[in-house]
Amino acid sequence: FPIEEDKIVGGYECPKHXVPW
């Protein structure tokens, strides 16, 4: 699961995992 610190502001996707939110 993506780490909260890795989330783009707005919760769109995680740059490291690429998982959509």
Curated annotation (Swiss-Prot):
What is the species of this protein? Protopterus aethiopicus (Marbled lungfish)
Domain of life of the organism encoding this protein: Eukaryota
Query: Which GO molecular function, any one, fits this protein according to its record?
Result: serine-type endopeptidase activity
* Location(s), subcellular: Secreted, Extracellular space
Residue ranges annotated as coiled coil are: none
One GO BP annotation of this record: proteolysis
Recorded protein name is Trypsin
- The residue ranges of the Peptidase S1 domain are 8-21
Top-level class of the enzyme under EC nomenclature: hydrolase
- Mainly localized where? secreted
Q: Which reaction does it catalyse?
A: Preferential cleavage: Arg-|-Xaa, Lys-|-Xaa
What are the record keywords, sorted? Hydrolase, Protease, Secreted, Serine protease, Zymogen
Q: Does the keyword 4Fe-4S apply?
A: no
* Annotated propeptide span(s): 1-7
GO CC annotation:
extracellular region
Q: Which family is this sequence assigned to? A: Belongs to the peptidase S1 family.
The opening ranks of the lineage are:
Eukaryota, Metazoa, Chordata, Craniata, Vertebrata
Please state the Enzyme Commission number of this protein: 3.4.21.4
